[in-house]
């Protein structure tokens, strides 16, 4: 984190994912290399898409936008050439073209620090887009969907985004949120995929 290179890995490390501190309540900063992004996170994303399409051959996820709700990142206070942040923010900052081209909102909005402002900006900039897929943690995604319903004066997210078919979620168990999402998105055609993207 302080800028020393090639200590444990042969290539340069400039990203450090802040862990949630689940093992002892303290956050840790885990190095994230270009190779880890490519061989773990993006490869995992491709695997998830391939599995989804193998189970749903008529899926149309790539016919419209993907709303990705992630965390934030900032300059590393120990080394100005590096960054620290949520793993989701590191992934968003470095997405390959095949994923970035479909993603919404803009990177500037997606990586905002203030969650209340971020939710408001995402709601206003995406509510009129053609969203086919969402990805994020259930809690903040639910807050976002409720705000969009308020802004649009709609009863259900399917009124706003009729082509929405998939929600990739992780970070926490989906079980406590399932009923609430079923009310927000009352559609038997809606698919939910739980994934845990470890730092």
Question: Where are each of the predicted segments found?
Answer:
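Active-site phosphate/ATP/adenylate-binding loop shared across adenylate-forming ligases
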Residues: 1-199
């Amino acid at each position: 984190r302080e800028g020393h290179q090639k200590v444990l890995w042969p290539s340069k490390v400039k990203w450090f994912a802040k862990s949630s501190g689940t093992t002892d309540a303290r956050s840790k900063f885990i190095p994230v290399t270009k190779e880890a992004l490519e061989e773990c996170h993006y490869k995992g994303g491709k695997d998830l898409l391939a599995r989804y399409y193998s189970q749903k051959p008529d899926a149309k996820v790539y016919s419209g936008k993907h709303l990705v709700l992630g965390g934030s990142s900032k300059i590393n206070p120990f080394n100005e050439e590096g960054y620290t942040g949520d793993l989701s923010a590191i992934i968003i900052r470095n997405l390959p073209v095949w994923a970035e081209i479909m993603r919404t909102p803009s990177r500037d909005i997606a990586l905002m620090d203030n969650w209340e402002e971020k939710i408001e900006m995402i709601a206003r900039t995406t509510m009129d887009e053609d969203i086919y897929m969402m990805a994020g943690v259930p809690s903040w995604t639910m807050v976002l969907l409720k705000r969009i319903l308020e802004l649009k004066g709609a009863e259900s997210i399917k009124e706003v985004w009729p082509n929405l078919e998939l929600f990739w979620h992780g970070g926490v168990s989906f079980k406590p949120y399932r009923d609430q999402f079923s009310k927000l998105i009352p559609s038997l055609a809606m698919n939910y995929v739980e994934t845990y993207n470890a730092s």
